[in-house]
Amino acid sequence: MDNARMNSFLDYSIINGETGTCSSRSYHADQGITTYQSCAVSNNNCNADDRYIVSRSVQIGAPPPHHHHHQSNYTHPNNLGISYSAHPNCGAGYPAQSFNTGYSHHYSLNQETDGNGGYPQCAPAVYPGNIASAISPHHHSYGGMVGSGQYPHHPYGQEQQGLALAAGCHSLSPVHGSHQEACCSPSAETPPPAQTFDWMKVKRNPPKTGKAGEYGFAGQPNTVRTNFTTKQLTELEKEFHFNKYLTRARRVEIAAALQLNETQVKIWFQNRRMKQKKREKEGLTSASPATPGSEANTEDTSDKCNSTSSTPSPSSSTSETINTSG
């Protein structure tokens, strides 16, 4: 095969959609950039989805905006077999068509530009497109959607197809791909359920063990009972005789005079009132009970009367002196 034949490429397009015949045209590659026109087979009796197209994948280098010199090396490793099977809804007059193509291109472009240097070679990519869409000259490989048919067997193997699909879907940089996998992997994992330990539980205070009195708890179980002196009890009894209920100012005054605190004076008056009510219920006291203070007052008044009666009056003493003189 001569160089002129190697530097040319084949363009297959179906001319007649009814008979399914294909015609091939050869073009001479001047710039070294190969373009492929998509071809489709559509029968009048078939559905709208019956479209057949060949997906190709090649290895390209990014073309610069200005081209000065291109060196293209084309190799034809083997022929790519493409077979089209007739749709079951089609008539019997359209048999299966098959033809062989010889442009499974694997080439490299060495380009010289006016810029800082050459462009790195990109990974193989597959560009999906429609059947009648215009393909840019920069897109060296493309693939179409296949409705119902057979995919052609690529000579590069399944591994290269997987790499091409992965490169087409994701970014061409492998660093970006690994970073994306690292970012997506933690979100896929579900966090384990939180485990509750004994030390995390709330510890509540135990109930009070003190004896409940008649009117609730008398205080903390370790509280020492107050022992009042005779003088303190006497002053408290005197105050209770005049006022059964104390104001806060009077309570503070009595506590300061008896060297007690307000709580002790308050509790004593509460207990004294309850004791008085209990005595009234039992009938030990009359309706107008005599308090020790009143009894002391009556005794004082009686003593005063006796003392005044025992002492002689001035009138009697004068009369006695007159009788003695007469």
From Swiss-Prot:
Residues 273-326 are annotated as: Disordered. It comes from the Eukaryota. Gene3D superfamilies: Homeodomain-like. Keywords: Developmental protein, DNA-binding, Homeobox, Nucleus, Transcription, Transcription regulation. Residues 285-296 have a biased composition (Polar residues). One of its GO terms (molecular function) is RNA polymerase II cis-regulatory region sequence-specific DNA binding. InterPro entries: HD, HD_metazoa, Homeobox_CS, Homeodomain-like_sf, HXA1/B1/D1. Residues 306-326 have a biased composition (Low complexity). Residues 221-280 bind DNA. It is found in: Nucleus. Pfam families: Homeodomain. CDD domains: homeodomain. The keyword Transcription regulation applies. PANTHER family: HOMEOBOX PROTEIN HOX-A1, HOMEOBOX PROTEIN ROUGH-RELATED. Belongs to the Antp homeobox family. Labial subfamily. This is Homeobox protein Hox-A1. The gene is HOXA1.
